[in-house]
C-alpha cells in the first residue's frame, strides 16, 4: 500500500474535511490533538496516509509540484489561479458564494465613469466584468475589503459571502451574485498514475459519503 500525502487547508475546511475522513475510516486521532504540529500520520489497516496543514493558497502549489498527492481547497482559490492538477470532486461542504457588493446607493450601470472595485480576487473580478463587457479599475486588498466603499477607496467589492452578516453590519448590500463555491478535492497528475489504486479508493469512498 503506497503512501498518499494529503495537503489540507487550515481552518474551516480542515474541520469539514476531517469529518469526511472519519466517516471513511481514515485515522484522524493525531489531528484531534494537534498542538503546533503540521504533519500527521493517519495510517491504519485501510490507508497509508500522511496529512499536512497549509494555507489555502499553498495547497495548489504542494499538489502541482507533487509534494502532496491530494489537496483539499476551496473553489475560490482554484478560480483565482491557473495551476496544473486534476479537480476530481466537489466535496459539497464549505459552501458560500462570490458576490458583487456595495453601499445601497451604488448603481452598476450608472454613467460612463470607470468603477473602482476592491477585491482579494482580481482574476475572478476581472473575468466577471469582462463577461459583462465593463472596464473597471481593480484594487487588490488583502484585509477587510468591506472597508473599501465605506472610506471611498472603491465603488464596490467582489468578495466571498457566506451569511452576509459582515456586509450588513457595515452597511453594504449584495448587488449581484457571481457564482457558488465549495470545497474541492484536487490530485497531482503524476500521482494519479503512480498511486492510482490508493487515490481512486479515497475518491470513491469520499464520493459515497457525499452522495449520502
UniProtKB/Swiss-Prot annotation:
Group of enzyme by EC: transferase
UniProt main location, coarse: cytoplasm
One GO location term (cellular component): cytoplasm
Top-rank taxon, per record: Bacteria
Catalysed reaction equations from the record: 1-(5-phospho-beta-D-ribosyl)-ATP + diphosphate = 5-phospho-alpha-D-ribose 1-diphosphate + ATP
Keyword Heme carried by entry: no
Entry keyword set: Amino-acid biosynthesis, ATP-binding, Cytoplasm, Glycosyltransferase, Histidine biosynthesis, Nucleotide-binding, Transferase
Database matches in SUPFAM superfamilies: Periplasmic binding protein-like II
Alphabetized GO MF terms: ATP binding; ATP phosphoribosyltransferase activity
InterPro entries per the UniProt record, alphabetical: ATP_PRibTrfase_cat, ATP_PRibTrfase_CS, ATP_PRibTrfase_HisG, ATP_PRibTrfase_HisG_short
Record Gene3D superfamilies: Periplasmic binding protein-like II (3.40.190.10)
Pathway field: Amino-acid biosynthesis; L-histidine biosynthesis; L-histidine from 5-phospho-alpha-D-ribose 1-diphosphate: step 1/9
UniProt key word Hydrolase: no
Compartment(s) where it occurs, according to its Swiss-Prot or TrEMBL record: Cytoplasm
EC number from the UniProt entry: 2.4.2.17
GO BP terms, alphabetized: L-histidine biosynthetic process
Listed Pfam families: HisG
Family: Belongs to the ATP phosphoribosyltransferase family. Short subfamily.
Entries under HAMAP family matching the protein: HisG_Short
Oligomeric form and interacting partners: Heteromultimer composed of HisG and HisZ subunits.
UniProt remark on domains: Lacks the C-terminal regulatory region which is replaced by HisZ.
Protein's name according to its UniProt entry: ATP phosphoribosyltransferase
Organism: Clostridium botulinum (strain Okra / Type B1)
Gene transcribed to yield this protein: hisG
Amino acid at each position: 500500500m503506497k503512501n498518499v500525502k494529503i495537503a489540507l487547508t487550515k481552518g474551516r475546511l480542515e474541520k469539514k474535511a476531517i469529518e469526511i475522513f472519519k466517516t471513511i475510516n481514515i485515522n484522524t486521532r493525531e489531528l484531534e490533538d494537534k498542538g503546533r504540529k503540521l504533519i500527521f500520520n493517519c495510517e491504519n489497516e485501510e490507508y497509508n496516509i500522511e496529512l499536512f496543514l497549509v494555507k489555502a493558497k499553498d495547497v495548489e502549489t504542494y499538489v502541482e509540484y507533487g509534494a502532496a498527492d491530494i489537496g483539499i481547497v476551496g473553489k475560490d482559490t482554484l478560480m483565482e489561479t491557473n495551476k496544473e492538477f486534476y479537480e476530481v470532486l466537489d466535496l459539497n461542504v464549505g459552501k458560500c458564494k462570490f458576490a458583487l457588493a456595495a453601499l445601497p446607493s451604488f448603481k452598476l450601470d450608472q454613467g460612463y465613469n470607470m468603477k473602482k472595485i476592491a477585491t482579494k480576487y482580481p482574476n475572478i473580478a476581472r473575468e466577471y466584468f469582462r463577461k459583462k463587457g465593463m472596464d473597471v479599475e481593480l484594487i487588490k486588498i488583502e484585509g477587510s475589503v468591506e472597508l473599501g466603499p465605506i472610506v471611498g477607496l472603491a465603488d464596490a467589492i467582489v468578495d466571498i459571502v457566506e451569511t452576509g452578516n459582515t456586509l450588513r453590519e457595515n452597511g453594504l448590500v449584495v448587488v449581484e451574485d457571481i457564482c457558488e463555491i465549495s470545497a474541492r478535492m484536487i490530485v497531482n497528475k503524476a500521482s494519479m498514475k503512480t498511486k492510482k489504486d490508493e487515490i481512486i479508493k479515497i475518491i470513491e469512498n469520499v464520493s459515497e459519503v457525499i452522495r449520502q
